[in-house]
C-alpha cells in the first residue's frame, strides 16, 4: 500500500549557517556593532541573544529571522522566550522547535479524517504515517495538509508506492 510520512525536521547545518550569517550581519550593523552577541547551542537547538537594551534584542531577533528565511528555514519553528535582565545586559532565548508533538499529531490526524479522504493516518512517535490504496488519494492528503496552517512547518517524506 502506498504511504508517506508527515514530519517536522530542521537541517542543523542550515541553522548553523543562518546563525553565522546573523552574527556577520550583527557585526556589519553600525547601530549594533559590539553591543550584542548570538550564542548557538547545537544540541538543544537554542540561540541565546545578549544585548545592552531590549530594543537591540528585538533588532537581533529580526536579523536572526531574516537569516533563517534566507537559508529557507521556516520561522514558524522559532519560539522566542521573554527577555530578562542579567546585570547590565539583557538576555533572551530563541528555541528552534523540531518534531511533531502529540497534540499537533492529533490535529493532523483529525484534519485528514475531516477531509473525508480514503486514507488512514497513524501517529508514530514524532511523525504521522499516512497510508492509502491509491497514490492520488495520498496526493490529495498532502494538498489538504499544505492548505491548512498548523503553526509548524511540515515536510512530507518517505513517499512509497
From Swiss-Prot:
Keywords: Nucleotide-binding. GO terms for cellular component: cytosol. CDD domains: YajQ_like. The keyword Nucleotide-binding applies. The keyword Nucleotide-binding applies. It comes from the Bacteria. Pfam families: DUF520. SUPFAM superfamilies: YajQ-like (SSF89963). GO terms for molecular function: nucleotide binding. Gene3D superfamilies: 3.30.70.860, YajQ-like, domain 2. Belongs to the YajQ family. HAMAP family: YajQ (MF_00632). Nucleotide-binding protein. This is Nucleotide-binding protein PFL_4775. It comes from Pseudomonas fluorescens (strain ATCC BAA-477 / NRRL B-23932 / Pf-5).
Amino acid at each position: 500500500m502506498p504511504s508517506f510520512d508527515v514530519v517536522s525536521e530542521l537541517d542543523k547545518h542550515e541553522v548553523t549557517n543562518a546563525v553565522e550569517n546573523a552574527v556577520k550581519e550583527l557585526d556589519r550593523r553600525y547601530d549594533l556593532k559590539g553591543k550584542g552577541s548570538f550564542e548557538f547551542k547545537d544540541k538543544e537547538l537554542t540561540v541565546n541573544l545578549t544585548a545592552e537594551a531590549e530594543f537591540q534584542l528585538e533588532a537581533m531577533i529580526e536579523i536572526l529571522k531574516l537569516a533563517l528565511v534566507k537559508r529557507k528555514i521556516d520561522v514558524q519553528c522559532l519560539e522566542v522566550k521573554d527577555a530578562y535582565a542579567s546585570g547590565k545586559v539583557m538576555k533572551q532565548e530563541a528555541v528552534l522547535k523540531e518534531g511533531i508533538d502529540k497534540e499537533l499529531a492529533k490535529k493532523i490526524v483529525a484534519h485528514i479524517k475531516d477531509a473525508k479522504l480514503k486514507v488512514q493516518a497513524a501517529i508514530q512517535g514524532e511523525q504521522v504515517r499516512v497510508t492509502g490504496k491509491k497514490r492520488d488519494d495520498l496526493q490529495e492528503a498532502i494538498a489538504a495538509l499544505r492548505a491548512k496552517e498548523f503553526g509548524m512547518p511540515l515536510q512530507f517524506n518517505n513517499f512509497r508506492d
